[in-house]
């Protein structure tokens, strides 16, 4: 089977009126230099597009298994009406491309509507931490009632709406059935404890829970000591210092957890991972 390439996808986005069937009049988001803005997960490359006055993620399969892996989830979502999730549709034979032999072919893509709002990863500081925790509790209960497991929950995969609701996106690993999101929700709660409300001017006299300790000056945030390392946040992101406040891992991460047994979970612009 011939597999389309990322180059084919990029080429199609440059001329959607020629390459797409349903999405002929879509408009991809572009970079400052005029190129198409792309991101990728392990299964799909993604481009944010505007189509019929709404924003979507157009998801291009990176392997022949990618579409197969999401077919059951997409089929269930097609008939599910809930404010907790957004449209996630497989468009069959949507993209036309030319393979290396000069043969014209088509491939499937996934069209995923983005909620109105912004990712939690970039706007948590603008919302009260307690309100975000409450929204997480409601989302967890709601998804459990639906029998829906996202299986890749992280700040970049949750959108905050103008009324403070949380809506998950990117259902590439989602399943209906037994839940596996408990750990993901706990990590999100830790994230909002640390980031929620940091950008607000608080009017109450209660001191902030997170302060810079006297022995670790010069940081926006100082965490607990773990494995002889202290998690800190500076203007450039999260990093780690030793017990003498000397940099061990320079601040560079969007978010980071404390070290446990020699490893720590971190978030970069590309996603979540582990460092040691």
Labelled PLM ranges:
Residues 200-276:
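Residue-level detector of conserved, function-critical positions
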Residues 167-199:
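C-lobe/activation-segment region of protein kinase-like
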């Amino acid at each position: 089977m011939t597999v389309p390439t990322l180059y084919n996808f990029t080429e199609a986005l440059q001329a959607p009126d020629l390459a797409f069937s349903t999405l002929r009049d879509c408009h991809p988001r572009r970079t400052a230099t005029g190129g198409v803005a792309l991101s990728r997960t392990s299964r799909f490359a993604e481009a944010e597009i505007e189509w019929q006055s709404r924003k979507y993620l157009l998801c291009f399969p990176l392997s022949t298994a990618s579409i197969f892996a999401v077919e059951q989830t997409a089929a269930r979502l097609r008939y599910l009406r809930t404010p907790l999730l957004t449209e996630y549709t497989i468009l069959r034979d949507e993209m036309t491309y030319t393979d290396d032999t000069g043969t014209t072919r088509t491939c499937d893509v996934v069209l995923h509507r983005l909620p109105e709002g912004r990712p939690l990863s970039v706007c948590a500081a603008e919302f009260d931490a307690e309100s975000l925790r409450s929204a997480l509790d409601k989302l967890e209960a709601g998804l459990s009632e639906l029998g829906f497991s996202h299986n890749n929950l992280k700040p970049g995969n949750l959108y905050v709406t103008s009324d403070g609701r949380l809506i998950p996106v990117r259902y590439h690993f989602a399943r209906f059935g037994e839940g596996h999101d408990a750990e993901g929700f706990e990590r999100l709660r830790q994230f909002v404890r640390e980031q929620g409300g940091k950008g607000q001017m608080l009017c109450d006299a209660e001191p902030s829970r997170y302060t810079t300790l006297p022995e670790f000056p010069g940081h926006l945030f100082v965490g607990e000591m773990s494995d002889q390392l202290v998690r800190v946040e500076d203007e450039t992101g999260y990093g780690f210092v030793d017990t003498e406040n000397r940099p061990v891992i320079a601040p560079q991460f969007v978010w980071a957890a404390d070290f446990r047994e020699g490893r720590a979970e971190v978030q970069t612009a590309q996603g979540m991972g582990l460092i040691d």
